[in-house]
Amino acid sequence: HTVVHSFPTRRSSDLNKSLRHNFFLDHREYPYKNVKPRIIAEQYMEDEDGKGLKDYKFFCFNGEPRMMFIATNRPVDTRFDFFDMDFNHLPFAQGHPWADGPLSKPVNFEQMRELARKLAKGLQQVRVDFYDINGQIYFGELTFFHFSGNCPFQPVEWDERIGSWWTLEK
């Protein structure tokens, strides 16, 4: 069923502005070229610890999860920590520093990895995002252009290594 709430004029204006925005023009990401903008309202989610949600983002190549990162402290002091599929911390950064201390392997790590594999099946490359809130997994999004393809890994040799995982059809 549909629930209608009245919004303050400022918020309504912001929503209307978003509906006129063409996201294709931002970074020329072709899947967005002919998408008609829509507003989707989701339930607000927070973890019981009150420290903000952690994003679990799996990089899949040819349908297989190869690495993931955990985004913490969003949006004020964002931290990214990258891990292989055995949950070993990887020695590079991208766009944000590492967390101040070690991060624990999520209890639902294996289930999230399997869900990422299923969602990535048949795709050459995709990032599959999840939240794990109080033991419940929530799907975030599928991303075909991580950082719009414009944020190198540091040190840069990781760009080449990760790029080698992507097999393009000829």
Model-derived regions, located:
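Phosphate-binding site of ATP-dependent enzymes
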Residues: 11-96
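Coil-to-beta-strand transition motifs
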Residues: 51, 60-66, 123-125, 132-138, ...
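A short, polar/proline- and glycine-enriched secondary-structure boundary/capping micro-motif
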Residues: 6, 77-83, 149-153
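A long amphipathic alpha-helix within ATP-dependent nucleotide-binding catalytic cores
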Residues: 29-39, 81-137
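Single conserved hydrophobic/aromatic residue that forms the stacking wall/gate
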Residues: 1-9, 39
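C-terminal active-site "lid" helix and adjoining low-complexity regulatory extension at the edge
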Residues: 114, 132-170
